[in-house]
UniProtKB/Swiss-Prot annotation:
The gene is pepN. GO terms for molecular function: alanyl aminopeptidase activity; metalloaminopeptidase activity; peptide binding; zinc ion binding. Monomer. The keyword Protease applies. This is Aminopeptidase N. PROSITE patterns: ZINC_PROTEASE (PS00142). The active site is at E289 (proton acceptor). The keyword Cytoplasm applies. Its cofactor is Zn(2+). The lineage of its organism: Bacteria, Bacillati, Bacillota, Bacilli, Lactobacillales. Aminopeptidase with broad substrate specificity to several peptides. It has more affinity for oligopeptides than for dipeptides. It plays an essential role in the metabolism, it may be involved in nitrogen supply or protein turnover.
Amino acid sequence: MAVKRLIETFVPENYKIFLDIDRKTKKIKGQVAITGEAKDTVVSFHTKGLHFNKVRAFSVDTNFIENEEDEEIVVKIGETGRVTVSFEYEAELTDNMMGIYPSYYEVNGEKKMLIGTQFESHFARQAFPSIDEPEAKATFDLSVKFDEEEGDIIVSNMPELLNINGIHVFERTVKMSSYLLAFVFGELQYKKGKTKSGVEVGAFATKAHSQAALDFPLDIAIRSIEFYEDYYQTPYPLPHSWHIALPDFSAGAMENWGCITYREVCMLVDPENATIQSKQYVATVIAHELAHQWFGDLVTMQWWDDLWLNESFANNMEYVCMDALEPSWNVWESFSISEANMALNRDATDGVQSVHVEVTHPDEIGTLFDPAIVYAKGSRLMVMLRKWLGDEDFAAGLALYFKRHQYGNTVGDNLWDALAEVSGKDVAAFMHSWVNQPGYPVVTAEVVDDTLILSQKQFFVGEGVDKGRLWNVPLNTNWTGLPDLLSSEKVEIPGFAALKTKNNGKALFLNDANMAHYIIDYKGALLTDLLSEVESLENVTKFQILQDRKLLAKAGVISYADVVNILPSFTNEESYLVNTGLSQLISELELFVDEDSETEKAFQSLVGKLFAKNYARLGWDKVAGESAGDESLRGIVLSKTLYSENADAKTKASQIFAAHKENLASIPADIRPIVLNNEIKTTNSAELVKTYRETYIKTSLQEFKRELEGAVALIKDEKVIAELLESFKNADIVKPQDIAFSWFYLLRNDFSQDAAWAWEKANWAFLEEKLGGDMSYDKFVIYPGNTFKTADKLAEYKAFFEPKLENQGLKRSIEMAIKQITARVALIDSQKAAVDKAITDIAEKL
C-alpha cells in the first residue's frame, strides 16, 4: 500500500480546536473547524480512533465515510475552493503513549495523573481530524477544558490568552506542522527564567520530584537558546520555551514547538548526587530539542523521507552547542564513543537503510527513527560536512537556509543550495553519496614498491553484496602532499619514502579527529609505524585505532587475535576516551570467552592488568577539582577491576554498600551502579533483589531507577528471574516505557537469557497491545539481534520472527537482526580458538 498524500486534495490554513477531556472517564469530546483550500469536491482527513457525530461543510451537514483501514474520514463537500469543514466527535485517551494520553505517578503514596500529548510522527490524527503530514502547515487555535482540580495548570505551544468558565484558550500558533501541536495539564511545579533576548523559559515537573531538580535543565535551556540565536543569526520565534518532564513518555524527548516534552530521566537532575555523565546526557538532550526549534519546527522536511533534515542536524548541533557552553566536558569525545560507534556498527550490515530513504508504506514511517542511522550516522555526516566547509561558512549557510525557508518545508537539496551559495563549494555533489547510499567505505592504505595506494570499498560485517558503491571520502590526513578527497576506487601516490621524509618521518594517519564516516585498514609498515608512535598520538587517534581494528576483526578482515596483540600498547592510558575504546573492545572479546573456563580466568587477569594503573590512580573517591574525564573514567575502571576479581576492589565495594544500605540512593552517584551490581553478584541474594525492587518502586530518581533495573537482572535464581519477568505486566511496578530496558538487562545475561527470550515469545500479544505504537516496540526485535550468538538461538529467532516479516514496521529490523546473528555465529566459530590462545598468551606476558 503506497502512502496516500491527503494534502493533494485539501491544503489546511487554520484549525480551531476545542477539546473537553475527562481524566476520570478517559473520554474526549472534540469540536474542530478546519479552514483551507479544497482541490476536489471530495476531500479526506486523517483520523484514528475518533467517532464522529457530525460533519459540516459550507455551514451545512454533509455526508462522510470513515475509512479505518486508511486512517481517514472522507467528506463530500460538493465544491472546490476555500472552505471550512467542521467536525464533532468523541474519542478516548490512548493507552500507548501516543496521541492524547495519561501519565501516572505518585506523591506521598497518592496516585495522580497528568495528561500529555505525543503527535510525532503521525499521531495527531488520534486527537483531532487533520491533514497529518509535515508539509500541511497551518495555524492552530487551541482551547481545552478538563476536569480541573486545585493546583492544576495547563501549558501549550503558545501563551494562554484567557480562561472562560474553565475553558483555557491559547493564542494562535505560528504556521507549523500538525505533529508539533502539544499540551500538558495536571498538577505541575515549575521554575522560570528569561533569555537575554526576552524569551521566557520554564522547566516543569510533577511534585514527585524536588523543585531543585529543575535548576539544571532551566539553566541549560536558557543558555542553549541564546547560543542558537547567535549561531543561526535567527531569533527564536515564539514568546516562550516550556520544558516538561512527563512520568510516562515513549521516546527520550519531543520537540513540540515551544512546549518540549521529555522522559523524566532525560530532563531532571538530582542536584545533590548526579554524575557528570547524567548532566552531560540531560544537557545534550535539551540542546537537541532546542536545535529542533529551528531545524524541524521553523523549517520542516517536506516528507518523512527527509527526516534526517530534522534529526541529523539536531544531533550534530547538540554537540556544537554543548562544546561552546561547557568546553571542559569535551563532548566531542562523547560523540566518538556513542554516536560514531553506534553508526559504524549498525551501518556495516547489508540491508541497512540510508539516511535519506523512501517511504512506501505508512507503517514504515516509524522505522525511519533508527537512532544509529538518521540520528548517529546523520550527525556524523554533518560533522564531516562542517569540517569540510569550515564552521564560519557552515553557520552562515544555516542562517541563509532559515531566512529563505522559515515557516516552510524543504528537501535536502534546499539545504545543500544554501551552504553552496555561502561556501562556493558543490555541497550536493559532496554529500549525495553519503546521504543517499547505505553503508560506508573502508579505506585501505598500503605501500607497494614505494607507492602509497589508497583504495575504498564498501565495508560489511557479515555477508554483503558489493554493488560497487563509491563515496567522496575526505582523507583529512596529517600529511601534506596528499589529495583532499578520495572519490575514485583507488589512487596511487608515487615516491612514498620522499613524501614521508617531507613530513618529518612521522606516521601517516587518515580521518583526523574521527570526523568522517569511514574506517581505515592500515597495511604492513603503515600500521607498525602508527603503533610505534601510539603514546604520542592524540587521544582521538588512539581511540580510532581501537575502533577501526575492532571493526575489521568483526568483519573477518583481520582476526580478533591480532587486536588482542596490540592491547599492551594501551596500558598507560589515562584518557577517558581511550579507556572507553578499550572497554568497548573488551566487551567484543567477551563473545569468545566461555564462563568459568580457563580462558575466562586469563581474560580477567588481562583486563585487570589493563586497568591496574588507573585503579591505583583514581580509586573509589571523587577528588575535588578532578576533570570531567576522570570522573567519567572511574566507573569504567572500577567495573573492569571488579570483573578481574580484584580482592581489594571487591572488599571496598562491599564496605561502601554496607555503609549506605539504609539509603542506597546516597551512594555517590558516579560509583553507585558499580556498588549495586557487585552486591548482587557477590551475594546472589533473592532478599536483596526484593530490597532493590522496593526501592525502585518508591524512588522518583530516574537515573537511580535505571541502575536498580540493571542490578536486579544479574541475579542467578530462576524463581526470582521469573518473578522479574512477570512484573513487566504490572504498570505499578514497571512502567510500559521501561519494559524494553528492563527486559534487555535480563536478555543480555547468559543465565537469564533463555527465560527472557521465552517470556518475549509467550507475551508477544501483550507487547503488541501495550507498545504497538510505541518507539520501543521494535527493540524487542533489535535487542535479540544485538545479543544472540549461537546457531540454536539463530534458528529460534528465525522461527519466531520470519512469520512476522509482513509487518512493515518490523520487517527491516527482523532482516537486519538475522544477518547480525548469522555474522556473529560465524565469527565465533571461525576465530574462537585463535582468540582464546591470544588472550592466554598476552595475559601471561603483560
